[in-house]
Every structure is written in C-alpha cells, then in structure tokens.
Design a protein with these regions (language model features):
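N-terminal charged helix/coil linker that caps or initiates catalytic domains
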Residues: 1-42
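Generic structural signal for residues in well-ordered beta-strands
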Residues: 15, 134, 142-144, 305-308
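Gly/Thr-rich phosphate-binding beta-strand-loop-beta motif of the actin/hexokinase/Hsp70
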Residues: 28-64, 167-180
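Hydrophobic "anchor" residues
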Residues: 62, 117-118, 184-185
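Glycine/GP-enriched mid-protein hinge/lid loop-to-helix segment characteristic of carbohydrate kinases
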Residues: 65-67, 133, 139-245
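Glycine-rich phosphate-binding loop and adjoining helix at the ATP-binding site
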Residues: 66-91, 95-166, 285-296
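Adenine-nucleotide phosphate-binding core of ATP-dependent small-molecule kinases
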Residues: 77-95, 215-218, 223-284
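Charged, glycine-enriched surface loops/patches
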Residues: 295-307
Length: 308
C-alpha cells in the first residue's frame, strides 16, 4: 500500500515529513519531501583554462566546490590534479561513498547520445578514447555532458522554469540550450543550442570553428578579458569604476553584438532568454542598458524583461 511504501522510504531515510496541507474539509494530508542529503553528486566542468568541481545534494544545494585556473591538457599531470581535487572534495564531505550517485563531466564539445562519446570538439583537444582515459583517474560512474546544456538544465531546475526558455552561455566559448520545462531540445544531431555559431557579422572575425563572423568570435569572455590579461573580474571592476573609456567602449561594442544575437533568439523561440556563463554572472548591473539595446532591434515589443 501507499502508506507501507511511505513508511519504508522514511525508514530508509529517503523522505521526511514536511508538515501538512491545508484542510479541504477532511483530514489534513501529510506533506513528504525528499531528504536532500540522502544522496549527492559531483559535477566536473572542464574548460580551456579552468577546472571546476562541485558537490551538490538532491535539492541542487552546493555542498562544496573548487575552481582553479589550469589549462586543459590530456596528460597524466592534468588528470592527476583533477583526481586529487576530486578526492579532496569527496573525502571531506562524504563518509559513505555509496551516497555518491555519480559524476557529470561537462565539456565544451558536442556529446553523443550515449554520453560517452565526443562527436565534435575544437575548443579543447579531446582524443577519441577520452572517456576511457578518465577511468584511469575517476573510479565512480560518470557521464559526459555538453557544457551549455548542463548549465541550462541547472538554471531551469534551480529556477523552477516550467515554460520554454533559452539559455545563452557566455564563457570562454559561447553556447546555449533551448529548454521546454526541464527537457532540452537537442536536435537531430545533438547540436541544438549551438548559438555561438550564429553568424552576426558576415565575413567578420575568424571563429575557432574555422568560419567567419560567428557570435562566439565577438561575445566569448576573451572578447573582454584580452584587455585585462585574462581576468574577467578585473575587467568588470574597471568598467564599474567608469573612468576607462577604452574598457567602456569595448563593453558597449560587446553588448551591441550580443543584442543582435539575443534579438535573433527572441524572434526564433519567442520565450525568455537567460544570460549565463562567466560573463552572464556579471551582467546584472548592466541588464537594463542591455535590454534597451535589444528591444531597439525588436519590431514587436518595447519591453525587454524577457532577458534575464
């Protein structure tokens, strides 16, 4: 019966009593919720120049995390550091390894449906046997995920989005995801959401993909950090101070280019657009100005509140 199953789950420590619903005339119904720390998972994010490891519980609360600047190399030295940092976080927080559900590894690459193969990668060099190479250093179950899809799902789940939403990731590369609730539309070839390769300037700057004029060439984080020796935080600190006209002009140009892409996404999907990634984390102070730039390109609306 339902009651017996609920009691069994409580005894196992998987669920707990969270109060009662308001009465609708009869006996008040009990509210049960998942015990968030019953299980946990690790996320490993690998980019061109950074490694991030995050431990989360079932409610997506961050238990522990570590981010470090280290250029990616498919070498023993790099993976030994990854293994050491992974073990340090897990050992410090999990006494019983059976509580660890597994590991999601996000990569700036197009991932196969089996989540074990990389079908396209140019941002960082990945060999064909990269999945098995990981097994020399990580001994818990793990799967590969596209970086922007991972970030988009996290935003969707944490923000409890139920409608369609576009996530635009602005980091060392530009990517994204189109989500309907908590489901990603990956497309026929798992390339849905590769917004970084929308052409915004025909015959423009060279992109890492080999084409010219891609959004990525204009709006990845390097478009800003190239002027502060790779330090994004420093760029926005100088920008906030408001005295460096060069930095101000660079950011204005960045927002103009980004507005072209955001307007195109709005025309295509007609839903909210979340600006994420490393640059997106700094955009809150400039969101009103950016919305004004975007709606100037929009023939249908003058309210830019769909940009978040």
């Amino acid at each position: 019966t339902t009651t017996r199953n609920l009691n069994a789950l409580q005894e196992e420590g998987m669920i707990e009593n969270a109060g009662e619903f308001e009465s609708t005339g009869g006996r008040k119904a009990t509210i049960y919720q998942c015990v968030s720390n019953y299980r946990c998972a690790v996320g490993i994010d690998i980019t061109r120049n950074h490694l991030t490891i995050v431990l989360i519980d079932l409610a997506l609360n961050i238990i522990d995390s570590k981010r470090m600047r280290i250029p990616f190399r498919e070498t023993h030295e790099y993976f030994s550091i990854l293994q050491e940092e992974f073990e340090a976080i897990v050992s410090a927080n999990i006494a019983d390894r059976s509580r660890l559900l597994g590991i999601g590894i996000s990569l700036p690459a197009i991932i196969g449906e089996d989540h074990k193969t990389v079908t396209y990668a140019t941002v960082i060099p990945l060999s064909l046997n990269i999945y098995s190479f990981f097994s020399n250093y990580i001994h818990e179950p793990y799967l590969f995920f596209n970086d922007a899809n991972s970030a988009g799902l996290a935003e969707s789940w944490k923000g409890d989005y139920t409608d369609s939403v576009v996530y635009l990731s602005l980091s060392s590369s530009v990517g994204g995801a189109y989500m309907n609730g908590r489901s990603i539309h990956a497309g026929d070839n798992n390339r849905g959401g590769e917004f970084g390769h929308i052409t915004i300037v025909p015959h423009g700057k060279r992109c890492y993909c080999g084409r010219n004029g891609c959004l990525d060439a204009y709006c990845n984080a390097n478009a800003l950090t190239d002027f502060t020796e790779g330090n994004l935080k420093e760029f926005f600190e100088i920008l906030k101070f408001g005295k460096n006209k060069g930095i101000i002009n660079i950011f204005n140009e960045y927002m103009e280019n980004l507005a072209i892409a955001v307007n195109s996404l709005r025309m295509c999907f007609d839903c909210d657009i979340i600006l994420g990634g490393n640059v997106g984390a700094y955009m809150s102070d400039y969101l009103d100005d950016f919305r004004k730039k975007a709606v100037k390109l929009n023939p249908f609306e003058k309210d830019g509140s769909y940009i978040q």
